[in-house]
Amino acid sequence: MAFWTEKTLAEMTPTEWESLCDGCGKCCLNKLIDDETEELYYTNASCHLLNLETCSCKRYPERFEYVPECTAITVENIASLTWLPDSCAYRRLYLGRTLPSWHPLLTGSKDAMHKAGISVKDKIISEIKVRNIEEHIVLWPLKDID
C-alpha cells in the first residue's frame, strides 16, 4: 500500500510530505483577490523564481530569503490555504480525495501531468515581464481531472 493511503497528513515524514507535491507550479502563480467580492483569480504570471520549463523553483531551499511572501504548505496551515487549486495533492488528500492518475507518485514522472494539461508548463510568463497583472487573469489553473 502507498503511504498516502495508510497515513494521515500529520503522520507523514517530511520526505513523504514533500513527495506529495506534483510540481505543477500552480501555487507559484500570482493570484488576485477582488476587493469587493473577495473572489480569487489566478494569473498566468509566475513567481520570478519558477523555472518556466521544469515548473520547479530555482531556489527552493532558500526561497523565503528571495520571496518572503512565499507560503510553505504544511499540515498546520493546509486547512486555511483555500487558494490551492483542487488538483493539488495536499488539498485533495486533506479533503479526503485520492491522488489523480496523472500524479508523479503513481506514474513515476511529471510527463502524464504535463500531458493532462494540469501543470503550468508552456502556459506562463515570469512576473518580471508583466506590466498590468489584471490582463493576465486565466481560468485554466482551476482545471482538475480524475
Swiss-Prot record:
Q: Where are the transmembrane segments?
A: none
Q: Which NCBIfam families match?
A: PRK05170.1-4, PRK05170.1-5, PRK05170.2-5
Name of the molecule in the record: UPF0260 protein Sden_1632
Q: Which organism is it from?
A: Shewanella denitrificans (strain OS217 / ATCC BAA-1090 / DSM 15013)
Q: What S-S linkages are listed for this chain?
A: none
Short name of any one Pfam family annotated for the protein: CxxCxxCC
Per its UniProt entry, which superkingdom is the organism in? Bacteria
InterPro entries documented for this protein: Puta_zinc/iron-chelating_dom, UCP006173
Q: Which family does it belong to?
A: Belongs to the UPF0260 family.
